[in-house]
Amino acid sequence: MNSVIIINGSPRKDGNTAKMCRAFAEGVKLQLQDATVETVNLYDFDFKGCRSCFACKLKGSKNYGHCSVKDSIMPILEKAAQADILVFGSPIFLIDISAQMKAFLERLIFQFATYEAGYKTIAPKRCNVATIYTMNVPKEMFPETIVANIESFIGHVFNQPKRICAFNTYQFSDYSKYAVEVFDEESKRKYRDCIFPVELEAAFNMGMKMAENIE
């Protein structure tokens, strides 16, 4: 049975990132009805990023190629490593992915990215990967260089990710309650009503396409 693991790196379980992840999952399920699709909300877990202990690089060790830190995120790291499709969804905070997503990727990727010749990867599966980003800024302000950097590491260990974005997101249910002068609520609402559904459809279609091409 095919396994799809979707990692939601947003603190919101029903926000824009979660909705994009959900749309992707629905696309997968339509194409692969017997697939196991699991969504993981990182903010439900108490964990930290890489501790630089280098246990995963120790010659002859049983931990070689495996993160040795035993905490609540460990079972998720193990599931992710065996997935057929991996999805990393994150809001953009301060021109970067969320801290929780960064910490998770440190733990997941570094254990498999060896210092052997050619920086050999020892991931148990070269799974297909998608990245989903949501942000409250327009497309021209998307931090392409920053996300491309982390995607290069993901691509080295697994496969180069397929990227899906949602821009100019609607942040608050009631803008009148917040001090917001740099965004126009009406234009944000129009974007949400007209464009966000198109972005959700793109996530849905990507889920279908990746499920169709699963090996």
For the regions a protein language model found, what residue spans apply to each?
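Generic recognition of cysteine residues
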Residues: 21, 127, 165-166, 194
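Short aromatic-enriched loop/helix-cap "lid" or pocket-rim segments at secondary-structure transitions
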Residues: 49-53, 143-144, 173-178
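Short, catalytically relevant binding-site loops at active-site mouths
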Residues: 93-95, 137-138, 170
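Short, glycine-/small-residue-rich phosphate/pyrophosphate-handling segment
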Residues: 99-100, 113-164
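Beta-strand-loop-alpha "switch" segments that mediate conformational coupling across diverse proteins
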Residues: 162-173
